[in-house]
Amino acid sequence: GGVQRAQSGHIRLLGQDLGQLSAGARDRFRVDHTGYIFQQFNLLPFLSVRENVELPCRFSRLRAERARQRHGSIDAAAAALLDHLGLHAELLGRRADELSIGQQQRVAAARALIGQPELVIADEPTSALDFDAREAFLQLLFAECRAAGASLLFVSHDQSLAPLFDRSLSLSELNRAAKPVEV
């Protein structure tokens, strides 16, 4: 994700060697080009659904501008993403801590996708869901990533999900030399 500098080798994302950037420049690059869905969602409980979704646009002018270009305003972008993910307008003003787990997960996905980042990193986002909810969420996530033109890096212990993805790696394969993959 670019938080820490690599101790050896190189990490290139969108043609940029992250090791060549200062800590501040890596932070800016990360917020401009990467959306995150955390396992625990990391929503700010005291903010509304809308405020949580719009948060990346407060830190990234690029993502704010992309949201405005695609939807006319940041508010409209948040509402459209939430609607596509199955959350309706009446929830926009509710506090994040008043939502069900499934609703919080969709808010986290909308926050990751707003402003069309090129890469979405999802860390165990389906671990708290039953089979039916998991399948529905994944289909929504795939559709939104496709619509935004975003690549999805999905981390899961659930091997049954592997066939849904173009490429999968096990942890044991990560430490082997691999051909570079441009994201």
Question: What is each stretch, according to the model?
Answer:
Residues 9-17:
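Conserved ABC transporter NBD signature motif
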Residues 95-99, 103:
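Conserved ABC ATPase signature
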Residues 116:
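Conserved catalytic motifs of ABC-family nucleotide-binding domains
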Residues 120-123:
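Catalytic Walker B motif of ABC-type/P-loop ATPase nucleotide-binding domains
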Residues 109:
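Hydrophobic anchor residue at the start of the ABC signature
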Residues 17, 66-90:
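Conserved ABC ATPase "signature" region
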Residues 1:
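Helix-to-loop junction immediately C-terminal to a conserved catalytic motif
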